[in-house]
Amino acid sequence: MLTLLAPAKVNLSLEVLYRRKDGYHELRSIIQSLSLCDRLSFSPSKTVHISSDSQDWQADLSLVSKAVELFSERCGQNTGVNLKIAKRIPLVSGLGGDSSCAAAVLKGLNKLWGCGYPCWRLMEIGAELGSDVPFFIMGGTAMMEGRGETVTPLPTLTQMWAVLLVPALDMPADKTAALYRNLRPDSFTSGEISDKLLESICQGKLSLSLCFNAFEKVAFELFPELVKYRWQFLEAGAYQISLAGAGPTLFTLLKDKNTAEKIYHNLCQKGHQAYLVSTLGPLD
């Protein structure tokens, strides 16, 4: 049996530069893997069988099934697989769980079926599945550009602690598309925010004040209950709070574990769904 981890992520920066002629948006984003991971177990089988320990997760609605089908087409394999997924990343949370699992599927089948594709080829295939998938092939700390297909590894961050607050909100299936539709002219930026953040990372001193998410203002307008959760996060002791991807998860990054633990415990005492995790380097 082959077992792989599929880590969550947060966008330290997420800039939308402009809408492209092909309908996609040009992005510039610095992404960071987290130690909150789904676990995928692969074993040989004559047919494809996918299961999960989460009753809310449906294989046919996820990128996982699409990843198995696409990889089978690309490598010319009709071999099956028995795939079991232990879900830990909250669904539809902005933490990239579906994309991360899809990337793990590509890496796992590449090993299980002996296809021998290099990393760059897996990233090409991943780009056909979704914008975040190429990043998850690599993981760690990276700059993502284009619509997500261009990923450049960055120096691994000195370990930091992230506290995640997952609001108890029912999010629409087209959440990300709705955010894109509601972007305003002042939502678009030049990429300089990510450049400044990149400079601070390369100097080994990440400046949290530079964290930015183009979706944040729009998300708080479309889902006004986020305001309440943000205030409760502040009351728990957080001071620099960002939206994770397309949300609704909110997060804060800290260098001191004790401070992170206090914020985490304060959130849990209030009955919130919260996680205390660390930043993560690239996975093999």
Curated annotation (Swiss-Prot):
Reactions listed under catalytic activity: 4-CDP-2-C-methyl-D-erythritol + ATP = 4-CDP-2-C-methyl-D-erythritol 2-phosphate + ADP + H(+)
Pathway: Isoprenoid biosynthesis; isopentenyl diphosphate biosynthesis via DXP pathway; isopentenyl diphosphate from 1-deoxy-D-xylulose 5-phosphate: step 3/6
Catalytic machinery residues: K9, D132
Record Pfam families: GHMP_kinases_C (PF08544), GHMP_kinases_N (PF00288)
GO MF annotation terms: 4-(cytidine 5'-diphospho)-2-C-methyl-D-erythritol kinase activity; ATP binding
Enzyme's top EC category: transferase
E.C. number: 2.7.1.148
Keywords, alphabetical: ATP-binding, Isoprene biosynthesis, Kinase, Nucleotide-binding, Transferase
Protein name, UniProt field: 4-diphosphocytidyl-2-C-methyl-D-erythritol kinase
Organism: Dehalococcoides mccartyi (strain ATCC BAA-2100 / JCM 16839 / KCTC 5957 / BAV1)
